[in-house]
Amino acid sequence: QQPVSRQPQQIIPQQPQQPFPLQPQQPQPFPQQPIPQQPQPYPQQPQSFPQQPFPSQQPFPQQPPFWQQQPVLSQQQPCTQDQTPLLQEQQDQMLVQVQIPFVHPSILQQLNPCKVFLQQQCSPLAMSQRIARSQMLQQSSCHVLQQQCCQQLPQIPEQLRHEAVRAIVYSIVLQEQSLQLVQGVSQPQQQSQQQQVGQCSFQQPQPQQGQQQQVPQSVFLQPHQIAQLEATTSIALRTLPTMCSVNVPLYRIVPLAIDTRVGV
């Protein structure tokens, strides 16, 4: 066997691949043109307001004194009706209308020594009321007042003694508390038309000689004042009869509380 002659293979030279010339990418930068910030300042024109001079202040008129502003009742000046309910709401809170026993003024004048005796420190009534006195009356003065009271009290009719003692006690208590009495006025129909509505003062008709109507007085008191008044009256009704040896009825002719008014 003849060996197969191997022809040498011709090696084809590999041509080097010419790389395509890469065109350099030239960056095309966009020219960033800076925006010129031109501040446009607004011209601040100061607005000068014309200064107007203020008008000269007029001095306030001097008001007259307070006592000259008060209306005189004798001149029949109308008074404001709006102030009356307001004053009643402020003052009349839980007030009870108490009827004061009415006796003839001559009887009260006759029992004036008894009233003075009850007002002094030598009386247990005055001690219960704790009336402030700078000095105590002498024993001789108390003895004189006691004798005068015991001389006048028996001269009053027995059926009027109870109301008389209560009347002087009421006058003492009301005088100490500086309360204003509210007196009812009963007027005939003929003279009632003479009153002017909205007026501060009015003329109280004088009762005729044949018709002398005695209207009892009344006053508005608080509950604790009523209790003090009852206690004082009870002491006086026990003190004067024992001191003067005079019979004084302990019953009441007129009820104490006749009406109740409650303030808003």
UniProtKB/Swiss-Prot annotation:
Instruction: Extract the GO molecular function terms from the UniProt entry.
Output: nutrient reservoir activity
Span list, region Disordered: 1-66
Disulfide bridge positions per record: none
Bias regions of kind Pro residues — which residues? Answer: 16-44, 52-64
Q: Record's Gene3D superfamilies?
A: Plant lipid-transfer and hydrophobic proteins (1.10.110.10)
Q: Which domain of life is it from?
A: Eukaryota
Biased amino acid composition, Low complexity: 1-15
Family annotation (Pfam families): Gliadin
- Tissue-by-tissue expression: Developing endosperm.
Instruction: Quote the InterPro entries the UniProt record gives.
Output: Bifun_inhib/LTP/seed_sf, Bifunc_inhib/LTP/seed_store, Glia_glutenin
Q: Which UniProt keywords apply?
A: Seed storage protein, Storage protein
Protein purpose:
Sulfur-rich seed storage protein.
The family note in this entry says: Belongs to the gliadin/glutenin family.
State the protein's name.
Answer: B3-hordein
The organism's taxonomic lineage, starting at the top:
Eukaryota, Viridiplantae, Streptophyta, Embryophyta, Tracheophyta
